From Swiss-Prot:
Fucosyltransferase which adds the fucose moiety of the nod factor on its terminal reducing N-acetylglucosamine end. Uses GDP-fucose as the donor group. The keyword Cell membrane does not apply. The gene is nodZ. It comes from the Bacteria. It holds the Pfam family NodZ. GO terms for biological process: oligosaccharide biosynthetic process. This is Nodulation protein Z. Its EC number is 2.4.1.-. Keywords: Glycosyltransferase, Nodulation, Transferase.
Length: 328
């Protein structure tokens, strides 16, 4: 059984409603702070962009029963936004009575993000009983701790079975080059549009890198596993790249936006997690753009990861242990 009540005492509440990669990365940061300050962790993934039902907490839908992560007690609630919270809470906006909160402006969200980042990096404990994290907290967790956090997660049985099925059919006996291409399909998240000023040139850059990596395995069967949010990108690579495969998914129409949408229901979140897990099993991972949160978890597990450096115009091999990257 999941702990489904807000705990008494000190806690960190991670409330996210965005794409799965952002939800997980931000949750890892909240967990890290909870562990450092010996607080409990509360997960609120209700009102998710993947579901039309605001009461469904997405985390228990995707992951098996987890009541403890690395010594941190974990609890699950829904709709923190409608809870009357005690005065001992930060950021201060959450102290307002529910009827006065309304919708937070972007400026308010960015202020909260900066406040929480400063708190997390300072490694000091807050005086407040509850710390509410309702903003993007990417890059706010030590990478070794982040790996440890992901190691504790257990995806649900359906996802495990689907990943094992695709792995047996497509991965076994092959070198698999995973390619994650975040296009946006009409939306500009994290300023990704700047990577797509010349769309055909961008896709050719990725294709060139795929061929370059393929040549490194002259005596092995190689396959390309593609994850993208764009029907145009999918069509282009299926046409240009022999040996490419992808999981079956429905795209939104061109220009209508990304895949994390209530249009696809909870099945969209499940499909995203399947793709995420399969990327983690690849021998090589190519990311364009590299800042997408979706492929963050896989990028910490795959041995050879190549991220595109827009300033230099080349793919660089990630070298996170050394704190840098080399072109390759």
């Amino acid at each position: 059984m999941y702990n489904s009540a807000c705990p008494e005492g000190r806690s960190v509440i991670s409330r996210r409603r965005t794409g799965l990669g952002d939800c997980l990365w931000s949750l890892a940061a909240a967990w890290s702070y909870a562990r450092h300050t010996r607080r409990s962790l509360v997960v609120d993934w209700s009102e998710s962009c993947y579901s039309a039902d605001p009461n469904i907490n997405l985390f228990p839908v995707l992951f098996d029963n987890i009541n403890d992560i690395g010594g941190v007690s974990v609890h699950y609630v829904s709709r923190t936004s409608s809870l009357a919270l005690e005065s001992s809470v930060i950021p201060a906006w959450w102290r307002l009575p529910v009827k006065q909160r309304g919708t937070r402006s972007d400026a308010q969200i960015f202020r909260e993000r900066d406040e929480l980042r400063n708190l997390f990096f300072s490694r000091r404990d807050a005086d407040a009983a509850a710390v509410i994290c309702d903003c993007c907290l990417m890059w706010c967790c030590d990478e070794d701790l982040e790996r440890e956090f992901y190691d504790h997660l257990i995806v649900n049985q359906y996802v495990r079975q689907e990943v094992d099925r695709v792995y047996a059919e497509r991965f076994l006996g092959n070198v698999v080059i995973g390619v994650h291409i975040r296009h946006g399909n009409g939306e500009d998240i994290l300023d990704h549009d700047r990577y797509w000023c010349e769309e055909n040139a961008a896709m050719n850059l990725v294709a060139h890198k795929i061929r370059e990596e393929r040549r490194k395995f002259p005596f092995r069967s190689t396959k390309i596993f593609l994850c993208t949010d764009s029907p145009a990108v999918s069509e282009w690579f299926r046409r240009e790249m022999p040996g490419l495969f992808a999981t079956e998914k429905e795209f939104r129409q061109r220009g209508e936006g990304e895949l994390h949408s209530a249009h696809f229901g909870l099945g969209g979140a499940v499909a995203a997690l399947v793709d995420m897990q399969l990327l983690s099993r690849c021998d090589v991972l190519i990311r364009y753009p590299p800042t997408s949160a979706f492929s963050r978890w896989p990028s910490l597990l795959v041995e050879r990861v190549f991220d595109f450096d827009l300033a230099r115009g080349v793919f660089c091999q990630a070298d996170r242990k050394a704190g840098g990257a080399s072109s390759g």
